Regions:
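Bacterial N-terminal signal peptides
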Residues: 10-20
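Conserved S/T- and glycine-rich ATP-binding loop of Class I adenylate-forming
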Residues: 1, 15, 31
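Noncatalytic, solvent-exposed loop/strand surfaces
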Residues: 24-529
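Bacterial N-terminal signal peptides that target proteins for export
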Residues: 1-12
Length: 529
């Protein structure tokens, strides 16, 4: 990100995943729900295409609930919200900033993960994270909490804006301060600040792993990755990147991707890909997983423009433990590297190469992902690819059969695709504001729609519909079919820079400033949360 960026930045039950408690079937417990392949799809039914988000009261950020329709509740967030919603065991988790501070002890800039009651939107607890002293180069002001947690039983795992992987008790401090971490009273205000008394409304940190201290990583402007939990392991991007100069990489030998023990937070292994020296800018992706050739692989979009398939189980090599690269595939085509005269494009030129920020989606043994850049760099060329990882080894960019199809009409994209299993149709968006419907088998475009505003989030497919929002605050609802049919378009009153999700018959949409719980026939409470 460059110094002009003041207010914008982006960041979603399956055999083989061990949950400590049986999930409710219709929960959305992580980025991508219960699917380690991270497909943005829910099998829920009865989700309304039409609703009224309500009107703001005069000279107020409060919404008049009497003007809503099909809205159960609305909760006020901060002033910037890029985090994606997670719903599990009766709790709703959403990351935001500390504007309009809920807790009078903390009135300065902080990152906040809210835990709300799923039925009514009331605050249960909040995780308050102080800003890094190094400032915007690592932790941009007012950006808020970006990571969507992974809820595994009574524990949730997430990445803080301080570049820490944390395990939190889903009950907060309700049952006291549990776990090995006991200093929440000092953690919340930050180093060098007066310690505060821990209350029942505070988060309970079970353990934390500081990636800057332990690994020497240098997050560029923000740490953002939504962890993946597979059996007893946590996989996460480190957010290692450039410094303020946008030329120097302070920590090129630090890992880009790691795996931790979910019980203790101990480092189990790191990637062997040596991505660091080749990072274009920053790394803010989230991993996915799938079984390939009978073994679990972890899929990771690198800051160097390569899609990686790592063996899920680290092996000892020399003095460390490493996730071995099974294969990699370069998403940047040759014509995005040099112009017609052979002169290399200089990053971040609109015609040039991009990294991968979107999450790779594993669906029916294929992987789907697009390339893109920090939105502050503007629009540019893009590429959406479908990869068949079966049998791939080493650099598979030129391997016959690896690339099933490509779609180069898409522009730069940070959206994760959503695929409807009923039709095998893929839906996605790009930063230029276009929504695409593509046949997953052929890569052929079925239709596209211009939302006339930048798209930061991802589409959600549910109940034969596609929900997607844009920077102007418009939420579009399409029929999930080969023929374009716009079912509804409603303005939510503030930018939508995250992804709508569905849990237990309710659609959750978060704008920059509010989160809405939407359900057919819902009667709103009189008072906004």
């Amino acid at each position: 990100m460059n110094t002009n960026m003041m207010t914008r930045f982006t960041a979603a039950a399956f055999a083989g995943i061990a949950f400590t408690t049986a999930l409710r079937a219709d929960d959305w417990p992580a980025w991508g729900g219960s699917d380690p392949g991270r497909n943005m799809y829910s099998p829920a039914k009865g989700i309304p295409a039409k609703f009224e988000p309500g009107k703001f009261k005069k000279n107020s950020e409060e919404i008049d609930m009497s003007t809503t329709k099909n809205v159960k509740w609305i909760a006020k967030l901060g002033s910037q919200t890029y985090g994606n919603t997670v719903v599990a065991y009766g709790h709703v988790y959403i990351g935001t900033n500390n504007a309009g501070a809920r807790d009078p002890r903390f009135k300065d800039d902080k990152s906040v993960l809210l835990c709300l009651d799923e039925k009514a939107g009331d605050l249960i607890w909040q995780f308050t994270v102080p800003k890094l002293a190094s400032g915007k180069v690592n932790d941009w002001e007012y950006l808020g909490y970006l990571s969507a947690p992974f809820v595994d039983g009574n524990t949730l795992y997430s990445v803080t804006s301080r570049c820490e992987v944390v395990a939190l008790n889903a009950d907060g401090q309700k049952n006291g301060n549990t776990g090995t971490f006991k200093d929440e009273g000092q953690y919340m205000p930050g180093p060098g600040k007066p310690k505060v008394e821990v209350t029942a409304k505070d988060a309970d940190i079970l353990w934390k792993y500081d990636m800057m201290d332990e690994l020497g990583v240098f997050p560029h402007n923000a740490a953002n990755s939504s962890p993946l939990v597979l059996e007893d392991k946590i996989y996460v991007c480190t957010s290692n990147g450039q410094d303020w100069s946008h030329v120097n990489i302070p920590s090129p030998q630090s890992p880009s991707f790691i795996v931790l023990d979910k019980k203790t937070g101990a480092l189990i292994g790191e990637d062997d890909a040596k991505i660091g020296p080749h990072i274009f800018h920053g790394q803010w992706t989230s991993p996915s997983a799938g079984k390939v050739d009978g073994k679990w692989q972890i899929f990771f979009g690198g800051g160097d423009g390569f899609l990686y398939g790592f063996d899920a189980n680290p092996v000892k090599e020399g003095d460390g433990n490493y996730m071995k690269t099974v294969w990699k595939f370069e998403i940047v085509p040759d014509d995005y590297k040099k112009d017609k005269t052979g002169k290399p494009y200089k990053y971040p030129a609109p015609e040039g190469p991009s990294e991968i920020i979107a999450t790779p989606v594993f669906y029916k043994n294929k992987i789907y992902v697009a390339c893109g850049q920090d939105p502050e760099h503007g629009e540019g060329v893009g590429r959406l690819i479908c990869i068949d990882p079966k049998g791939l080894k080493g650099d598979a960019t030129k391997t016959k059969g690896a690339l099933v199809w490509e779609f180069k009409d898409i522009k730069r994209s940070i959206s994760t695709v959503a695929i409807d299993p009923a039709t095998d149709l893929l839906f996605t968006g790009d930063y230029s504001g276009f929504v695409y419907c593509i046949d997953t088998k052929t890569g052929k475009l079925q239709w596209q729609h211009d939302m006339q505003a930048h798209i930061w989030g991802s589409p959600m497919v549910v109940d034969g519909k596609v929900f997607i929002g844009d920077e102007d605050g418009d939420l579009c609802v399409f029929e999930a079919s080969r023929e374009k049919k716009l079912l509804n378009e409603v303005n939510m009153g503030a930018p939508i820079l995250a992804t709508p999700v569905v849990a237990n018959g309710t659609l959750f949409v978060n704008t920059q400033t509010h989160i809405y719980a939407i359900a057919e026939g819902a009667k709103a409470e009189e008072k906004q949360k």
